[in-house]
Amino acid sequence: MTSIIKLHTISGAMDESPPCYILQIDDVRILLDCGWDEKFDANFIKELKRQVHTLDAVLLSHPDAYHLGALPYLVGKLGLNCPIYATIPVFKMGQMFMYDLYMSHFNMGDFDLFSLDDVDTAFEKITQLKYNQTVSLKDKGYGISITPLNAGHMIGGTIWKIVKVGEEDIVYATDFNHKKERHLSGCELDRLQRPSLLITDAYNAQYQQARRRARDEKLMTNILQTVRNNGNVLIAVDTAGRVLELAHMLDQLWKNKESGLMAYSLALLNNVSYNVIEFAKSQIEWMSDKLTKAFEGARNNPFQFKHIQLCHSLADVYKLPAGPKVVLASTPDLESGFTRDLFVQWASNANNSIILTTRTSPGTLAMELVENCAPGKQIELDVRRRVDLEGAELEEYLRTQGEKLNPLIVKPDVEEESSSESEDDIEMSVITGKHDIVVRPEGRHHSGFFKSNKRHHVMFPYHEEKVKCDEYGEIINLDDYRIADATGYEFVPMEEQNKENVKKEEPGIGAEQQANGGIVDNDVQLLEKPTKLISQRKTIEVNAQVQRIDFEGRSDGESMLKILSQLRPRRVIVIHGTAEGTQVVARHCEQNVGARVFTPQKGEIIDVTSEIHIYQVRLTEGLVSQLQFQKGKDAEVAWVDGRLGMRVKAIEAPMDVTVEQDASVQEGKTLTLETLADDEIPIHNSVLINELKLSDFKQTLMRNNINSEFSGGVLWCSNGTLALRRVDAGKVAMEGCLSEEYYKIRELLYEQYAIV
């Protein structure tokens, strides 16, 4: 491999932080995932902010926030503008993840890291691919192709194969699963034969999973014991990834009449549950062969649930039939979303059960419950929620919003409560605005010229308007139509309302989400539902049973090491794992695979070029203008004489950086080749470049009317007077008497080479 390969580990190295890496192939910089954790840690964003304008492509491997959570922020706030590639399910389900993430945090506070508009803008830039579809990068990435392969972890999950033309391949494989599940097939790593470079994770290197049968029995036993004890079950799941496996499993369990679970309610609760299931119905071809064959044979969609109720709010859960409930709710970390709300309500009841299905980052509520949660333990939580504005607060909000939307709107006069009918009250009750007849100015002392008909105005005030007309009829006042009613909605022409991109509101996506989420035309601006944030500190006594049952869908440590032994990569970069887990994978690759192993630290840039004596040198414009190129077989070549130098090149940074950020911008150094003076250029022997085949040269001689024939591996020309034969080291020897034909054949021979 002659390309210079580097990897910058921005996040996800020697720890379990979200994956975010920059892979550099010569001058092409590719961002591999851009995850964000539950706390929205901004430390790695500072480093990524300096690199965002140097990126040439982005590859997304999974749809959850742990792999693409920072994408809306990069596009909406940092101005990321390069091609983004993902599979179709990652595109669709990724939107659902980010919608639900935004709404979950917005309902708990003022969330301003990104908006739903940023989510839509980011996902509009994604190029959607299918498995095994090879796409060539453009512009600077010319010559590099990418291919997505099935990872088996989530629907649409991807192992990326990156290949540069004429060179070996690079495989980016993290969070893969080799086991077949109910709704997904296993990964396809066996199709990759000894990759040149493998970038893989050590997340499960020291983790041993329970067998699938034991895991499922543990879940079913917990549910049965809880509901029969008149308790509720809260299952913390993600939005649109691993939840599909659990939902399909539980719906099948509820169909079994012998289980007796049909008497209890089963619900899926998140902000976009309806859309998640609808997307799952349309993506059967991305799932396991078993589901695909069942769908093709019986025409029965496996995600047409008969027992799962789709809920989008706690109010929907309360409307379910009375009695024990099993609720699949987001998010799995219990830091936000409906899982936190239900935890606050159900944790104190000893009959209830809380099931955690995945490992989360240290410091989250879910991790705290798993590590140290004895029965009766008290936990202090900040409980924040939004409530609708009412009464005076609602009136004040509507008045303020109305003035912001249109400063021409004048506050309507409040109906007089007093029965006083003084002349001043009558004057103040006159409706202000534009009139075609003369009216008395308000707030100004008046003379007796205007006669006030007090009794008439008190009963039924009537103001005659003079209609203005021109050659085409009555003049239309556009303001009358722009302000349609008092609710603050703007008037939109009918042709704008009939645009194809306007759809009806779907369950699970509210008015604000439809407006900001790109489902409604941007010209239609709907007011947010007026709410306020209420925060209080609560002490929760955890009496409910807390269990963690693994439904992560990743390969265990033992299986992962066996897969690495089968792949036999030449070089391995181990990322995304604890220091101990990283060393376990590194030692296995060194001892059993025989590969060069790299274990970078967070923020480190490592050079994994296969040839250690390759350097990248930039030619100056003056030197390039003096080169004399000779045309070869597939390219043009030239001899270069120059002096090696060093130039400093600053890394491009955003224009809106602060003073501290600007000072932290590092400068990169690049090697250059400078022009030599004429008396400094050394003399060199001519070099002939080409791999000549005598059979091809025989055709050249025939085109020039020179007879030739092979005999004993020698090409005889001119009736056997000249001989051409190949000697060692790829040289061609020419023997014969000096003659006119000798020089003619030699000239034709020289033309087959690029001489520099």
From Swiss-Prot:
Gene Ontology annotations for the cellular component aspect, listed alphabetically: mRNA cleavage and polyadenylation specificity factor complex
Locations listed in the record: Nucleus
Pfam families: Beta-Casp (PF10996), CPSF100_C (PF13299), Lactamase_B_6 (PF16661), RMMBL (PF07521)
One example GO MF annotation: RNA binding
Record-level GO BP terms: co-transcriptional mRNA 3'-end processing, cleavage and polyadenylation pathway; mRNA 3'-end processing by stem-loop binding and cleavage
UniProt superkingdom: Eukaryota
Keyword Transmembrane helix among record annotations: no
Complex formation: Component of the cleavage and polyadenylation specificity factor (CPSF) complex, composed of at least Clp, Cpsf73, Cpsf100 and Cpsf160. Interacts with Sym and Cpsf73 forming a core cleavage factor required for both polyadenylated and histone mRNA processing. Interacts with Slbp and Lsm11.
Function: Component of the cleavage and polyadenylation specificity factor (CPSF) complex that plays a key role in pre-mRNA 3'-end formation, recognizing the AAUAAA signal sequence and interacting with poly(A) polymerase and other factors to bring about cleavage and poly(A) addition. Required for the cotranscriptional processing of 3'-ends of polyadenylated and histone pre-mRNA.
Similarity-based family: Belongs to the metallo-beta-lactamase superfamily. RNA-metabolizing metallo-beta-lactamase-like family. CPSF2/YSH1 subfamily.
Protein name: Probable cleavage and polyadenylation specificity factor subunit 2
Organism: Drosophila melanogaster
Gene name for this UniProt entry: Cpsf100
